[in-house]
Curated annotation (Swiss-Prot):
<keyword id="KW-0812">Transmembrane</keyword>
<keyword id="KW-0328">Glycosyltransferase</keyword>
<dbReference type="InterPro" id="IPR002213">
    <property type="entry name" value="UDP_glucos_trans"/>
</dbReference>
<dbReference type="GO" id="GO:0016020">
    <property type="term" value="C:membrane"/>
</dbReference>
<keyword id="KW-0325">Glycoprotein</keyword>
<feature type="glycosylation site" description="N-linked (GlcNAc...) asparagine">
    <location>
        <position position="308"/>
    </location>
</feature>
<protein>
    <recommendedName>
        <fullName>Putative UDP-glucuronosyltransferase ugt-47</fullName>
        <ecNumber>2.4.1.17</ecNumber>
    </recommendedName>
</protein>
<feature type="signal peptide">
    <location>
        <begin position="1"/>
        <end position="21"/>
    </location>
</feature>
<dbReference type="Pfam" id="PF00201">
    <property type="entry name" value="UDPGT"/>
</dbReference>
<feature type="glycosylation site" description="N-linked (GlcNAc...) asparagine">
    <location>
        <position position="52"/>
    </location>
</feature>
<keyword id="KW-0472">Membrane</keyword>
<dbReference type="InterPro" id="IPR050271">
    <property type="entry name" value="UDP-glycosyltransferase"/>
</dbReference>
<keyword id="KW-1133">Transmembrane helix</keyword>
<dbReference type="GO" id="GO:0008194">
    <property type="term" value="F:UDP-glycosyltransferase activity"/>
</dbReference>
<feature type="transmembrane region" description="Helical">
    <location>
        <begin position="497"/>
        <end position="517"/>
    </location>
</feature>
<keyword id="KW-0808">Transferase</keyword>
<comment type="similarity">
    <text>Belongs to the UDP-glycosyltransferase family.</text>
</comment>
Amino acid sequence: MFRYHSILLLAILYFFEYGLAYKILVFSPATSKSHLISNGRIADELAKAGHNVTLLEIDFLGIVDSTKSAKLVKKTIVRVPKKMQGFKNVIQSFSEGVMEDEGLFELLKGNIAYQTVYNDLCEEFLENEVMFNKLKDENFDAFFAEQLNICGFGYAKALGIQRKFLISSCPFFSHVYDYTSHPAPYASVPFISDMSPEPTYLERTNNLLRGITINTFFYFSHNRLTSIFRKKFGDDFPAITEIVRNVDIIFLATDEIIDFSSPTLPNLVHVGGLGVDDDTTEMGPVFEAEMKKGDKGVIYFSLGTIANTSTIDKKVMESFLEIVKKFPDYHFLIRADKNDKNTKDKATEISNVFVSDWLPQPAILHHPRLRTFITHAGYNGLMEAALAGVPLITIPFMFDQNLNSRAIEKKGWGIRRDKKQFLTEPNAIEEAIREMLTNPSYTKQAHRVRDLMRNKPMGARDRFIKTTEWVIQNGGVHELLTEGRDLSIIKYYNLDIIVPCFFVAFYFIIFPFFKLFGGFYYYSCFGHIESKYKKD
């Protein structure tokens, strides 16, 4: 009898643990290792909550097998060999031009190249009918995908998945605002171009023009993506932007404490830092020994993967190594590409530096002897540093990095420097390090940011899981979708009212005023001359 009751109790517990579990598909194209890791964290968090998660990784770059993206969820891998090299070439071109200032033409050219080959990869992926049918048979309850390209949402629609969640893997960019028909705050947030803390007229103009240009490009890119799906699934397949416009929730992988404060949406939820603490592992004896060096502490330096130290101008790293020599009381940990022989050779001549192609970043950031992190301001590293309370010296190169660095500067827990200063003004970077090491305000503010993030009423994990389950349980929450998403630009901004009113005002008020004023001015200035001629 006791055995019977025990089995019954276990069965009941199993039901409550797994009986309400949902089947969820996480769509994760391999656009970079950092994006694979971010999506892996999402999959793991859903799995921890008891859900049945499929992590679908499409190998755009040949990096899926070597990237430990998820710890709990088994990966389903799809190869796209035909177009892979084209995508690799685009990423390589970004790395080669990373030190150049990006004008509007270069910005547009880069986006066209990236989205064009991404759409090609999407089309190749759709040819895999075996995988499509296998996934369709799963009858997933929900779907997650990033914003870099919205191919995944067309795929989810074709699979018949009802509940869709958009992951904005970096700050909310202008074209993502455009998906939702929510006006982007170009006057205050440097989406596409750099803007100083108090933006000038020209800076705001440049940001606006770039934003309009990029949004116009995405309009045509999305039309092509729609045509790809209609070619595969029929002419009645909905426009890809219509699918995205009606996603249930937008999860923003940033934190409102460190991001630019700007207008938001009812269905937008911040989940910055999701899964970050789980990656804080032991660093091992080799790195632990390095962290003990330096009389006054350790400084960590990493420029990410796009600013590849083996392809950028070698003078960049040589310049930084010269700066390292000026801080003998501090030990520097430098991440350099595995093929960067020049940096490694030069570093052997310097006693207070350790160079490696891999460093346990989360563990380093949480180490008590770390004084500052010199970074390119990629969002993964930024979130890790924020949760560890580490002040930053940011040197942005491209993509969202400039936006991130300006937000850090504005919130007071970091110093920003320009990438060109490695070559033209290295003393500016040296001065930033000295300022960071001697001014405690940056560390104090970094600790405040950490505490605010960690002590929020609801953390990222609870927000993410509870919101996801709430939406699925209720068959979507259409009540949160903004009414403006279905309006045209003309209606949304009331241009059909404003423009006619302007012409009416011009005709009945402004035009008569100028006519009267002009006649008076003409008579007062030239009337006496005409009178004189008439008398003569």
